Amino acid sequence: MINKSQFESLENELDVYAKKRQLNSDLAKQYIDDYFELLLLFFRQINEKESIDLNQLDQYPVVPMNFLERYQYMLKRKYHFMGYSQMKTLKNELIKMNASYQIRRKNQNNN
């Protein structure tokens, strides 16, 4: 199970590169790739999917607004500050939405 500390560990490394405007460096790119993969793995995990089917997003229980557009934006601008910033924002939204979903799910099972 992916936890918040795994993201924070990568963010600590990436924030240093971001402050120096070096997100496009070879070392930073590896951290960004790892962060992006962790984000996608987390998305699959909370939706209980083996892979992401972008045509079936409306069937997933936890999907932030404009996910497809944001996903495409992150792919295009992954190594830019705004792409990294979007990843962090999406991660925070997924954590909150998943917590809410798990509570609703638990309450439904108790009724």
Residue ranges, per PLM feature:
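Conserved nucleotidyltransferase catalytic core and NTase-mimicking acidic/glycine-rich helix/loop elements
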Residues: I2-N109
